[in-house]
Amino acid sequence: MGFSRGGQIALYASMRRFQKLWNESGIEIAAYIPFYAQCYAGYIDDSDVSGPIRLFHGVPDDYNPIAPCRNYVERLRQSGKDVQLTEYADTWHVFDSPTNPITPTALPAAQTVRNCVIKEDRPGHLINATSGEPFTWQDACVERGVHVAANPIALKATQDAVKALLTTVFKLE
């Protein structure tokens, strides 16, 4: 389970290629649960995943917009993977935080790659697909200015969904 950039890690940890590289223990992860993940990076063999994968995302999220996650989830579904994207209307980035106000709050200094297309052209090497150069946080596609807001209704729905998933994968009933 991970949130925002941690959600990106939770999502891409499902890739078998990364599991082979980094999982020396041999322990398998029961489920991958990314919250409002950034799905912009196209990795080599990124359709070869284990699962289940359950993503939770707000539709108006302008930090990590939902469209790339929709596209990635559709690609995974077409290849027969166990993946679901739960979308919440009127739900912004970090919707699960009780310290955020309910009304969208601007974070003008926060960086986002919402306008970037990032691809892995060889193992471990990410490029800005527009320029063909190695991706950096100084690239022109990197912007500042996002919004966050709590959504207690989406939080409760997500808690229920995660509980149901974990009950199933750990056979708790």
Which residues are covered by each model-predicted region?
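Short alpha-helix in the alpha/beta-hydrolase fold that links the catalytic acid
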Residues: 65-75, 100
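Sec-exported extracytoplasmic/periplasmic mature domains
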Residues: 14-19, 77-81, 167-171
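Short beta-strand/loop motif that positions the catalytic acidic residue
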Residues: 55-57, 61
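Active-site pre-Tyr helix/loop in NAD(P)-dependent dehydrogenases
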Residues: 35-38, 59, 91-94
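C-terminal catalytic histidine-bearing segment of alpha/beta-hydrolase fold enzymes
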Residues: 82-173
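Conserved Rossmann-like nucleotide-binding pocket used by diverse enzymes
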Residues: 33, 56, 84
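Stable alpha-helical elements in mature extracytoplasmic
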Residues: 5, 9, 68, 72, ...
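Primarily recognizes the serine-hydrolase "nucleophile elbow" in alpha/beta-hydrolase
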Residues: 1-50, 62-63, 67
